[in-house]
């Protein structure tokens, strides 16, 4: 039984959620509302809600990260000092870094420590996140791969780490009776570790060497990033595939449901994933996933999908071709995918978090 009030850090809430912001909002809706006070820019009908500034949200661009860190350190820190019998739950590794505050923090990955690339947020990952995790009362990881990474890279004891399964939106993501259309789907941010250039080259090779696939299309769903998107689109143009690649910068849950049910397969060729929520969402729709053999993706797929080497363009191309050719596998996963996805439930995730907090 939880004896202390949970202060829920909802500063990462987004009105167009993806990735961590999806997790943030879904967990806030699933944890027992009688146990938490939600601090967020808006509420999904939570009863104990304390409004915070809207400009902390990732919807407000790069500077929102700096504003949110300042808010975490000072405003959230002062709030927690006043609520001395409370414990902070943060659905991402952000919390006041001074000691004396009890916190439980959810970690999704330590990607920038594994695959460093030039980003203004690199110091955040190298210096700030490790301090937050070392100060935390408990660390929750979304996969065994992430838990091992936290242990190995930050020298944090496994005794401090708990592994839980995330969930997906069962209300909106499900199999539909749709005829498969002639396209592959990517749902990913336009950052280097998502490996989009290699996918584009593999797609080009697939169409080039298989005349029967000239009508095949690629739909890329992900927020425009001025650092990387222009170069990806230029690569499309150089390869001569810009007329068969559709760049979609955001979709609603209803649109995502249609895309996941209509595509031949979801392609996730990431260099590393701490979890891989789109893979789970695709399985929930009974859709085949062609996925990287790195990070947590093999855990999520549980031998149900096609694994590829993300460093090897030929391997990605081969995985795509198998997805088109192996109709038996596609039919099998139409049935087994939703059954596997049922193991992942936000309510179960929330109950596990409540149990972890109750033991502190």
Predicted features and spans:
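Carbohydrate transferase catalytic cores enriched for Leloir-type hexosyltransferases
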Residues: 1-360
